[in-house]
Amino acid sequence: MLSRFKCSRLQLQKRAISVTKATTTTASQPKRRRTTTFSDALNKGPSFEDFVSGKAAKFTLDPLQQARSNIEEAKRLPRWLKVPIPKGTNYHKLKKDVRELKLSTVCEEAKCPNISECWGGGDSSKATATIMLLGDTCTRGCRFCSVKTNRAPSKPDPAEPENTAEAISRWGLGYVVLTTVDRDDLADGGAHHLAETVCRIKQKAPKTLVETLSGDFRGDLEMVKVMAQSGLDVYAHNLETVKDLTPHVRDRRATYEQSLSVLNQAKKTVPTLITKTSLMLGLGETDEQVLQTLQDLRAIGCDVVTFGQYMRPTKRHMKVVEYVKPEKFDYWRDKALELGFLYCASGPLVRSSYKAGEAFIENVLRKRANN
């Protein structure tokens, strides 16, 4: 009995020594996270013991995370795209008049970065506003645009043409831009409403030059003729982007060829009419695609083109692929003039109705009128 007890005691001692050795060995080696199927890269990171001991700081950042950080750094807003907060006497006056007359402006609806410069005006330059007609709700949903959308917007305000003309006469502008939301719910796309507004402005302020920035009227060229013959001075319709990106950027009802046909018809209807379009850069377009677009525009006699940086209005809209440097915008301006465009405004903050372009076009139109 005694020998059995000694034997059992000896076995227990051996087991205790074995467990102690195993514990000592395990404690000397920090535990690593067990392999998972989530990502091999994650398993190469520091363990909990590394964080406790302070060794985690020696680990290099996961390459995937490093790549994401680099992308985010590149996406930060460059200094040349930062603008001041809107202010000034003219700015507040225009804003007050717009509210009183129940008008909408694309400057506000589209969150234009130039609103401070255009509305602010100054001693040597008159304030400029782009008035948006046919309401503030569009029937289309382009991926770059922040204007509200609805399949059935409210009916056009019959007093809008008169109110718009009254506002223009109050401001004493030498040049005004009228734009519209797309109204596919209307039989004529709103062409007659816009044409009437142009006529009222010419009656109340005959010296004011009028530019209209309108949609494609679903490709109805008869409505393009109505607009071209309304008495306006500049017919603007935006291509927005190059041909290959159009299906991904614009509403499916807007096509590259359809937009070219609108500009072409306007020029054919009134050959002396200045035609104008605008392109956004930073959407992933190539130089070859931009050059081809310029050549397509010159082939139909388009007179003016503007280039501006695409700015993502909200996180719900398409992302910016690239922030194009100012030097590249200078390159495209020179290229456009080389191809024969009458004028080209090109810069990160330039928009289709940018006032620097309007001042130039105003001078061209007045010289034509005097000759």
Curated annotation (Swiss-Prot):
One of its GO terms (molecular function) is 4 iron, 4 sulfur cluster binding. SUPFAM superfamilies: Radical SAM enzymes. It catalyses: [[Fe-S] cluster scaffold protein carrying a second [4Fe-4S](2+) cluster] + N(6)-octanoyl-L-lysyl-[protein] + 2 oxidized [2Fe-2S]-[ferredoxin] + 2 S-adenosyl-L-methionine + 4 H(+) = [[Fe-S] cluster scaffold protein] + N(6)-[(R)-dihydrolipoyl]-L-lysyl-[protein] + 4 Fe(3+) + 2 hydrogen sulfide + 2 5'-deoxyadenosine + 2 L-methionine + 2 reduced [2Fe-2S]-[ferredoxin]. Residues 20-29 have a biased composition (Polar residues). It is found in: Mitochondrion. It is an enzyme of class 2 (transferase). Its cofactor is [4Fe-4S] cluster. Binds 2 [4Fe-4S] clusters per subunit. One cluster is coordinated with 3 cysteines and an exchangeable S-adenosyl-L-methionine. Residues 121-342 form the Radical SAM core domain. Residues 1-24 form a transit peptide. The keyword Metal-binding applies. [4Fe-4S] cluster 2 binds at residues 138, 142, 145. It holds the Pfam family Radical_SAM. [4Fe-4S] cluster 1 binds at residues 107, 112, 118, 353. Its EC number is 2.8.1.8. Pathway: Protein modification; protein lipoylation via endogenous pathway; protein N(6)-(lipoyl)lysine from octanoyl-[acyl-carrier-protein]: step 2/2. InterPro entries: Aldolase_TIM, Elp3/MiaA/NifB-like_rSAM, LIAS_N, Lipoyl_synth, rSAM. Residues 20-42 are annotated as: Disordered. GO terms for cellular component: mitochondrion. The keyword Protein biosynthesis does not apply. Keywords: 4Fe-4S, Iron, Iron-sulfur, Metal-binding, Mitochondrion, S-adenosyl-L-methionine, Transferase, Transit peptide. Belongs to the radical SAM superfamily. Lipoyl synthase family. This is Lipoyl synthase, mitochondrial. It comes from Lachancea thermotolerans (strain ATCC 56472 / CBS 6340 / NRRL Y-8284).
